[in-house]
Amino acid sequence: MFESLSDRLTAALQGLRGKGRLTDADIDATTREIRLALLEADVSLPVVRAFIHRIKERARGAEVSSALNPAQQVVKIVNEELISILGGETRELAFAKTPPTVVMLAGLQGSGKTTLAGKLAARLRGQGHTPLLVACDLQRPAAVNQLQVVGERAGVPVFAPHPGASPESGPGDPVAVAAAGLAEARAKHFDVVIVDTAGRLGIDEELMAQAAAIRDAINPDEVLFVLDAMIGQDAVTTAAAFGEGVGFTGVALTKLDGDARGGAALSVREVTGVPILFASTGEKLEDFDVFHPDRMASRILGMGDVLSLIEQAEQVFDAQQAEEAAAKIGAGELTLEDFLEQMLAVRKMGPIGNLLGMLPGAAQMKDALAEVDDKQLDRVQAIIRGMTPQERADPKIINASRRLRIANGSGVTVSEVNQLVERFFEARKMMSSMLGGMGIPGIGRKSATRKSKGAKGKSGKKSKKGTRGPTPPKVKSPFGVPGMPGLAGLPGGLPDLSQMPKGLDELPPGLADFDLSKLKFPGKK
């Protein structure tokens, strides 16, 4: 997502660092690079001009000249202006005071309306709503069938009285279907109605007339314009045409996971004045989220998206299990069973590469992230599942014959089993040292108190009271996901992330005082 734009902007701002004072020439050179980066990303020219003008004005003002770190202040200005053109504040879906809330989807053919309808329905269902999908795309062959398949995957009913375009059936009336779907929702007490309409390969009067007729028939609370982020400069033209012909209250961006330059996201909000509500980043139903302008700007500038990562963790981790795992890690008692549970929870959050990409500075290690293969985690999972409960609880009992049995049972080599067991012990020791060194209450003290009484130094004599014992060797922090020890060293295929950029083991600015104990994890069911 925005990889090329992120690389160009990061490189442009990197040249300012280390300078105690910025000259007009420095500002001009930096804004020139930013301008080229935005234009290459297919951002609309008027948007680029206004964006660069605002940055220059602020960069030459008092807020930069009087700052202790002028370069960092310019980065802050660019971040704030990016947030501004992306919409400023997060805008949620507006629900009607009296159900049902009617959401109409409009857009060009192939923009992803039908799939997005299922994603939105699945999200609303997860929030406790009872959505109904209405199939009003009666012109594209198999469009109704596609919506029924998507609705079944999302666990949401589909209202489709007409089979859609086919040689056997005549043309249907999408306006009548939309009105009947709304009546069906009221009769059966659905609180949200999502209407999937037909698209075209281009803007034409027939498309506009049909969409406007459906809008007038159902009087929707929200009209979402579904925009393909890969269409480049045409995004502005298409959005403006739909705005004049039909009118819409929000934008949903699709295909943000593609390799396109993605300038549509930076243009459509500024040109139309309509907020971006949702962003779709994949084909799965869960690859869909509310669009946060501040987080998107942070990711574009290579500063990561820690808050989204935390929110995803809150959805999959159980509070009690997380506390128990943290206590076991601190005491050096983490088992392979605990490790397996944590790994399965992390995998529910999405591909590991995507999760690591949300960390600050991840853009500097793209090559390493590109090597991350989730299939290697399947092999690790198979190895652990091939062990007996006793072996998972106490890996020390896994001798040579047991390792051979585990390898044969899980379809891997003995060396892979050896690597997993050995690196599990190393990671458990490292994580115990890390948590103990952080001074977290109740963590890391159990194992420490065991050795506090009668502790002996290298000479075999007891340490004198009040004197320091031998300094323990420094242990390098493993780079991995919380609760997943030794991710960097799992067998075969996973990259060595030990050479991570400076600062990745720290929270980014603004989150330094973040209290992890206040995270709201779902309770144990």
Curated annotation (Swiss-Prot):
* Uppermost EC category: hydrolase
SMART domains per record: AAA (SM00382), SRP54 (SM00962), SRP54_N (SM00963)
| Low complexity bias locations | 480-497
Q: Which Gene Ontology BP terms does the record give?
A: SRP-dependent cotranslational protein targeting to membrane
Outline the segment boundaries, as ranges, of region: Disordered: 437-525
Q: Which UniProt keywords apply?
A: Cytoplasm, GTP-binding, Hydrolase, Nucleotide-binding, Ribonucleoprotein, RNA-binding, Signal recognition particle
Phenotype of the disrupted gene, per the record: Depletion of ffh (SRP) and ftsY results in differential expression of 14 proteins.
CDD domains attached here?
SRP_G
Q: Which cysteines are joined by disulfide bonds?
A: none
InterPro entries recorded for this chain? AAA+_ATPase, P-loop_NTPase, Signal_recog_part_SRP54_M_sf, Signal_recog_particl_SRP54_hlx, Signal_recog_particle_SRP54_M, SRP, SRP54, SRP54_GTPase_dom
Q: What is known of its domains?
A: Composed of three domains: the N-terminal N domain, which is responsible for interactions with the ribosome, the central G domain, which binds GTP, and the C-terminal M domain, which binds the RNA and the signal sequence of the RNC.
Name of the protein this chain belongs to: Signal recognition particle protein
